[in-house]
Amino acid sequence: MLRPALSFAFAASLALAAHARADDAPASVRYQLGLLSRGPTWTPEKNAHTDSIQAGHMANIVRMAEAGALVAAGPFAGDGQWQGLFVFAPDVDSLESLLAGDPAIASGRLSCTLRTWVAPPGLGEQYRQRKAAVTADGRSPRDSMVTFAWVMLHRGRKYDSRPTPAVEKLVRQHFEYTEKLRADGRLVFAGAIEGTGDLRGVLVMQGDSATVARAANDDPAVRAGRFAPAILRWWTAWGTIPGH
């Protein structure tokens, strides 16, 4: 539950959170978002050693998911600095030990940056229900991968944390715009990043790269320079995003 003493900057940033369904209006929860990037020992080469690390990385993902700690995961397309992400359940403890069990992180091939992501509940729930179902031959359904645009909203060149009337108006316009995106099906999940860092929020969107880029850049808060979007293509298992 959100504390009433939250600062204006954080309370305003919660306008990023778009609900999966307006008639439900679910309360937000505090996920732990782990952004995976190239680590200090990352190399582009693939060999028996890197294959072993990758196999251990995937096995650890399965362990964390089966333990109920991991509710979403998946790689980013391409071969840039950002490699993928983890989303951990709100009530998970000992994240450090979970991440230490990942050979890719322990070896320095990947680095994980943790942020608190305030977003609607239900992430990964449909996937877990589907995996729990058993087919007639006693096997769980195979995973199907789907892709979304992962839009990270960073502080823009004109970001202002002061609660001025102009800022309040811009935050309202931003919220109204994201609600419009949600209503027409382009925005499927979203939430604010807690704290005062550079990353302020994340939008998960449907559509091709050009369509998503236009939608992100048409955000009044982006046009005004409050936010600067960075768009990645994210692969994840079908059912991770509620309704998708």
Task: Please provide the spans of the model-predicted regions.
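N-terminal secretory signal peptides that target proteins for export/translocation
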Residues: 1-2
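Bacterial N-terminal signal peptides
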Residues: 5-17
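Conserved, structured core segments of small domains
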Residues: 23-244
